[in-house]
């Protein structure tokens, strides 16, 4: 099973380079980091949220939405796929707005981060779908399990991965968030 892992992706041009590399290398799993700008905004949300600056948090969430929609418009020209990713963006942004309404705590902060990491991965997934590849975002939450000692349960993880692969034989490439 071929796996490609990518480092920091700063902008749209680097995103295009990663997509081209994935098309050339054709890995079974491509591990992509969150886009650098989204990472910066996640930090800004955490800081403003923990300081109870709700307006700043919501404004930052809106900036994430605008940025993702702009990327979608530039990179995903197929109208059907563009609409699908925009629906995903709006769904994610709505969830995040609801989450930042709650009182700040670490669990909710992790949920916000998970949403944005997933959204970043989904942008790559849809870009590759536009190129004709059957691509799916890898739901890593289904695969990871810790044992009673709070360590990864390797036998469970191996079994889960094999089952996941068997269930998704029609997928060319999985995109995994880093």
Language model features: what each stretch is:
Residues 1-178:
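Nucleotide/pyrophosphate-binding catalytic subdomain
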């Amino acid at each position: 099973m071929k796996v490609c892992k990518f480092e920091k992706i700063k902008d749209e041009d680097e995103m295009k380079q990663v997509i081209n590399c994935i098309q050339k290398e054709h890995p079974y799993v491509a591990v992509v980091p969150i886009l650098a700008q989204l990472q910066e905004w996640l930090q800004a949300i955490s800081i403003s949220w923990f300081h109870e600056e709700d307006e700043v948090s919501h404004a930052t969430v809106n900036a994430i939405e605008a940025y993702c929609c702009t990327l979608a418009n530039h990179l995903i020209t197929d109208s059907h796929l563009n609409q699908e990713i925009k629906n995903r963006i709006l769904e994610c942004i709505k969830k995040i707005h609801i989450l930042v309404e709650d009182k700040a705590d670490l669990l909710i902060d992790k949920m916000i981060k998970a949403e944005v990491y997933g959204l970043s991965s989904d942008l790559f997934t849809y870009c590759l779908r536009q190129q004709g590849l059957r691509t799916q975002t890898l739901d890593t939450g289904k695969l990871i399990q810790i044992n009673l000692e709070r360590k990864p349960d390797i036998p469970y993880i191996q079994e889960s991965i094999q089952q996941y692969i068997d269930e998704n034989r029609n997928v060319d490439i999985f995109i995994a968030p880093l």
